Design a protein with these regions (language model features):
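Nucleotidyltransferase catalytic core that binds NTPs
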Residues: 1-151
Length: 151
């Protein structure tokens, strides 16, 4: 949890009028599972006013099934991975997973991110037309330099 996450939460709550719940994913699709110590360190960052949930839903399609009618607040770098075929068995498999966003009424609030010295935003991502309307972007004007992070 860093200042960028807090800023994203605050901007998202202001834009949507909804309360934010942080998700801690113990088993991410492109990272090793979190250790007990990593989970404890993560949870220790929250205070009693923060809302959080822990899952093992490594893909956003799984999160969609767990949390229907939600708005997921993510960075553009994360949205790129949602459409990366390396996380699926085939293009057809990826499209079936993406369709779950429609099935479960999922929306994405996408924040621009600096990745390898280039700022990417929602407009830079090739989003399947069947879910394009489910994505809303916050662009560079909302980006805070102190929380830039190259990944």
């Amino acid at each position: 949890l860093h200042e960028g996450h807090i800023r994203m939460r605050d901007l998202a709550e202001k834009k949507t009028g909804m309360q934010t719940t942080f998700e801690i994913c113990a088993k991410n699709a492109d990272k090793p599972p979190l250790t007990f110590q990593e989970i404890k360190r993560t949870l220790d960052q929250f205070d009693e006013n923060d809302s959080w949930v822990m899952t093992s839903a490594g893909r956003f399609s799984e999160k969609a099934e767990m949390f229907p009618n939600s708005v997921f607040i993510i960075g553009a770098d994360t949205l790129l991975r949602v459409f990366d075929e390396k996380f699926y068995s085939s293009n057809k498999d990826m499209n079936e997973h993406v369709e779950r966003f429609n099935d479960h009424n999922i929306h994405f609030l996408v924040f621009g991110r600096k990745v390898k010295d280039k700022f990417i935003s929602l407009e830079d991502i090739n989003i399947p037309s069947k879910i394009r309307s489910r994505c809303t972007g916050f662009n560079e004007g909302y980006y805070e330099p102190e929380w830039e992070k190259d990944e």
